[in-house]
Amino acid sequence: MSDLHHLLTFPERPISESSYLPELTRLLSAGIPATYTLEQAAAFERGEEVTEEDSNTTPLHILCRSLPSFEGSSKLSEDEESVVLKLMDTLLEYGAGWNFLDYENKHIGDLVLERKYPQDHCIYQRIVDAGVSAELLLRKIDGGEIEFIEDPEDAATEAATEAATEAEVIEGVTKGSEEAPFEDATAADQATYLKTDLEYTDDALVTKENRDGVMMDWETDIMSMAAKSLVSTRSTDECVVLNIGFGMGIIDNFIQDEKVTKHYICEAHPDVLAKMKETGWFDKENVVILEGRWQSRLNELLDQGEVFFDGIYYDTFSEHYQDMLDLYDVIVGLLKPEGTFSFFNGLGADRPVCYDVYRKIVELDVANYGMECRYQVINLRTLPNWNDVKRSYFNCTYYYHPEIRFA
């Protein structure tokens, strides 16, 4: 174990600024990377090389693993918490990646929660804020809004920035492509998905060959609440609602129970459209089916300027958060001033800390449109069963239900 790693095990208590911060700064200033892993240090001591795949346990992991339990008799004092935050800030300032997974496939956020720190605790929230900053920075870089200076002396700095940024990516998705392998185009690419055969089972809609979960009946309670949100600010004379992505029709059945005036459904997959025809959705008097991708069909409504919605819901498969950013541009033109927009919120739900990061990112993004996102936290009564599904798309025991309205 290197001096840097040993320091972050907190060998001395109390954790004081004078005992830890100057030494941490000295080590990092001397050139030890803030991403220097335990595996790299061990390999160096043995005179061996370590591959990137074998090297995961960063100084931030060691710091978080060394925190005393929040509920134990040796819990941190307020002064110690303040010092720990300064140590974390210093590591992050020197390029520590916030989103690495250690030798047990654990995120630093997982380690903090395991030690019983609540999700509103300042240490956990510092990790979430680092994730939000990294995601927004990455978006700026990918969008070409940041120009790197082309200078030989800056080449190493630029390379380090790119490496750190790559390590900090969260793949924001709706459903389907969470941790999808590169070759699994069905889950990762909308065009491929629309050409893929689907199968309805007793409790799910899955891709026929890969067994990717498109929609499952554990979402029923979520869809019931969502349907009520969509009509919560309904007009007295009429209520017009849009659902983007029919799937199993769970939320659409709940919307019908609300006796809406007009119920628009936008669906692009031919197998789902065939199921809708078979089950009579095309024959319902108050239902309008928009066949095709929302990217074209909703823009047609926007151009016509004749239909505006009390509620809009979004739940698609194999689309990314970038698609939602594009959707916001359309939503603001189709939603009534008092209307509600909501969506199936599986953004980053592969682990709690990523879920919390995207919770904040959505709040920031919709604020750019003069909208406010409020969440209801639902403890899931029925947890997902992934036995007959290729991969999970939701791994939290609770659900952040979003309600987005103009502020």
UniProtKB/Swiss-Prot annotation:
* SUPFAM superfamilies per record: S-adenosyl-L-methionine-dependent methyltransferases (SSF53335)
Provide the binding site for S-adenosyl-L-methionine: Y193, M223, F246, G247, M248, G249, I250, I251, E267, A268, H269, W294, Q295, D315
Q: What is its EC number?
A: 2.1.1.-
Kindly indicate where the leader peptide sits in this chain: none
Mention one GO biological process in which this protein takes part, according to its record: methylation
Kindly give the InterPro entries that the UniProt entry links to this protein: Arginine_N-MeTrfase_2 (IPR017408), RMT2/GAMT_Mtase (IPR051038), RMT2_dom (IPR026480), SAM-dependent_MTases_sf (IPR029063)
Query: How does this polypeptide assemble, per the annotation?
Result: Monomer.
Tell me, in a sentence or two, what this protein's role is.
S-adenosyl-L-methionine-dependent protein-arginine N-methyltransferase that methylates the delta-nitrogen atom of arginine residues to form N5-methylarginine (type IV) in target proteins. Monomethylates ribosomal protein L12.
Similarity comment: family membership: Belongs to the class I-like SAM-binding methyltransferase superfamily. RMT2 methyltransferase family.
Put simply, this protein is called Protein arginine N-methyltransferase 2
Q: Which species does the entry assign this protein to?
A: Kluyveromyces lactis (strain ATCC 8585 / CBS 2359 / DSM 70799 / NBRC 1267 / NRRL Y-1140 / WM37)
